[in-house]
Structures are given as C-alpha cells and as structure tokens.
Amino acid sequence: MRRRKRLIIAAAVLLPLVLFGGYTALWLYAAHRVREGLPQWAAAMRTQHLDLSWQGVRVAGYPLAFRLEFTKIAVCDRDPRFAADVLAPMLTAGARPWHPFVWHLDLPAGLTATPAGGVPGSAVVSAPAATGTVAIVDADARLWLAVHEPHVAAGAVPLAARLVYVWLILPARPPSGPDEPALGVALDVHDLILPQVPPPFHNPVEEASLGVTVMGPIPPGPPRQAAAAWRDAGGTLEVDHVALRWGDLSLTANGTLALDADLQPIGAFSGGVGGYGELMKALAASGWIGKRKADLATTALSFFAKTGPDGRKRIATSFSIQDGEMFLGPIKIGPMPHIDWD
C-alpha cells in the first residue's frame, strides 16, 4: 500500500517534469528551426522581388510564445511596379505555438518608407511607432497595421495624421483572369492634416477611408506599359468603399474604376452625400468650378435631398468619371486630375 502511494506521488511529481522538459525541448528545437530558416525565407522572398535583410535577430518568448526580435531590418521591393524601401530600427514578431500562422508585430521605434532609389522630391513616409498582425487565412496572406502619427513628405505637400489603419490582402496565387483579385488594400485615416484647406472646411479631416481590390493580373514592366497591359486584359479597380467625415460633409460610395484609351480613369459609383452645400463651396473656393455653377449645383441637388434621422439633408446619388470630367449625378463638377504614368 505504501509502495503504491509512493509510486503515485512519484508519478505526480515526475509526469509534469517530463511534460515540461519535453515541451522545453520542443520549444528549443522549434526556435532553432525558426532561426535557421530565416535565410531560406529571405531567399524565397527574393523570388517575389523582395529583399529582406537585418543586422541582428534573436529568438525569445519562452515558454508561451515564439518571438523574433530584429534590429535594423529592411524590406526592399525590387518589382518596378511597386519599388519601395521600408526600414525599421526594431521589429518584434511574436506568435503562440498553438497559433503559428498568426504573428503580431511591434515597431516601437517606428519606420520609414521611400520609393526605391531615393529619387529627389519623392514621397517619404515616416512614423514614430506602429503595431500590426500578419496572418495566413485560407492560404491568403493578410497584413494589418496601425501606424501612429504618420507623416508624408512629398516635396512641398506635407501630410500628417493622428492614426492610420492599413489592411493588405495577398491572394495565395496570382489571378489568371480579370475576374480574380490580384491585391486588396484598405486605408482608414483619422484626423488628417492637409497642407491647404478650402473654405468653409478646416483641419483636420475627421476620418477618410478607402478599400479597393485590384482585379486581374498586373503584368511586369514600366508603369505605363503595365497599366496598358492590365487595361487590355480587362483589369478593373473595384472600389469596395469610400467614406469621408469632414465637418458637415459626409460621403459614402462604392463602384468600379477602369482605364480608358489614354490610360485615364473612367468609372461609376453610387452612394450618398450629406453637406453637399459645403462641398460645392469648397470646390468653388479651390477653383474647380465657378461660384455661379456651385450655387446652381447646390440648388439642383437640394431637390433630390431628403432629411435624415439627424435632421440633416442628404442625397442618394451617383458619381461618375468620363472623358476626363467628374459628375455628381447629372451635374458636372469639374475635371478629373490627370495621371502621368511616366
């Protein structure tokens, strides 16, 4: 009886130790494989035109996580369609052993993104801190980032915001036709500071969001050639949502964009606009349309407006781009900015 009791006590003590020791050995083995596999991962990324490098890396997180701690990490996209360099002094990527396809990111010292080659006058994006998540869902790669206090320096046109959320979806395989997605991107910008604001608006823009899906294969090559080939293959840009809150102005829309024979955008959207009077005043103040035309447009739009639950008038309308002109419903509101592909 005593011997049996001692065996039970010994088993109760030894079993957790054996399990803990086995888990420790498994964690150390997995950590070693992760560290040793990093160069192979970087080599695999080069086949996708991505150069990944770092000055130092450490595997930590025992016992309940795997955590990769990088110093001076750089990701350089060598694809001429998207060429850009992203640099970060520190990056921590952590995952739970039971969720190996979900990694949480932390960039406590921020990041800097520039077009590849550092062309003078090109846009430079910087932020003092960012967090995010990378996950594999149904074989698709998904990235979510929260970028804190980003600043965009683009020549003499600086932009800043309090917070920007970024979503990126990369399908597991490239599209074989125009009905399959090549890329999904979404932005949600809070408290955007513009360099110039037409009256009656003022800084900041409370919220601006955009979600798009690029449909059809994006061929390699210089931007003009790639855009022409994408257009000729039936490529479109599905605008899943557009939303804006800026003072009394509120706007929501969704639709489809394509490129015309001159590689300029054409498209049609449906949505709603509140505060359209302020919008017309701003268009007139910025010189897009004359004051008389803005007043006539405001009067015409008021016939279609309905009072919402908040007591404000709102119109359900369409927005279209055709022959280089923009239309809000049947009313032409001005020229579409020209895209220079060279």
Question: Where in the sequence are the language-model features?
Answer:
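Flexible, membrane-facing loop/turn or short amphipathic-helix motifs
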Residues: A74-A83, L111-V124, E149-A161, D191-N203, ...
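Acidic, serine/threonine- and glycine-rich low-complexity intrinsically disordered segments
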Residues: A156-G247
